[in-house]
């Protein structure tokens, strides 16, 4: 089974080798048919502390690295477009 990949924005980089990434998702409410935005925070591994708050990044599933970290940052949006 392939690893999931998500795109989000770094909201915190205060921890060593860890960033908190907010991932937004949109869906239509089943009854009211209104588009709803929901977000979730993921703790992701950042080995070199290279990502700062406000960066748009891609994260990929990985083995559990700590109590909360199950994701790893692979690249930023700037690297992907360059």
From Swiss-Prot:
One of its GO terms (biological process) is translation. It comes from the Bacteria. The keyword Transferase does not apply. Signal peptide: none annotated. Keywords: Ribonucleoprotein, Ribosomal protein, RNA-binding, rRNA-binding. One of its GO terms (cellular component) is cytosolic small ribosomal subunit. One of its GO terms (molecular function) is rRNA binding. It holds the Pfam family Ribosomal_S17. Gene3D superfamilies: Nucleic acid-binding proteins. Belongs to the universal ribosomal protein uS17 family. PANTHER family: 40S RIBOSOMAL PROTEIN S11 FAMILY MEMBER (PTHR10744), SMALL RIBOSOMAL SUBUNIT PROTEIN US17M (PTHR10744:SF1). Part of the 30S ribosomal subunit. One of the primary rRNA binding proteins, it binds specifically to the 5'-end of 16S ribosomal RNA. This is Small ribosomal subunit protein uS17. It comes from Afipia carboxidovorans (strain ATCC 49405 / DSM 1227 / KCTC 32145 / OM5) (Oligotropha carboxidovorans).
């Amino acid at each position: 089974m392939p690893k999931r990949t998500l795109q989000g924005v770094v909201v915190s980089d205060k921890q060593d080798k860890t960033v908190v990434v907010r991932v937004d998702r949109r869906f239509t409410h089943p009854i009211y048919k209104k588009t709803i935005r929901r977000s979730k925070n993921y703790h992701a591994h950042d080995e070199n502390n290279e990502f700062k708050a406000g960066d748009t990044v891609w994260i990929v599933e990985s083995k559990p690295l700590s109590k909360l970290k199950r994701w790893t940052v692979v690249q930023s949006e700037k690297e992907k477009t360059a």
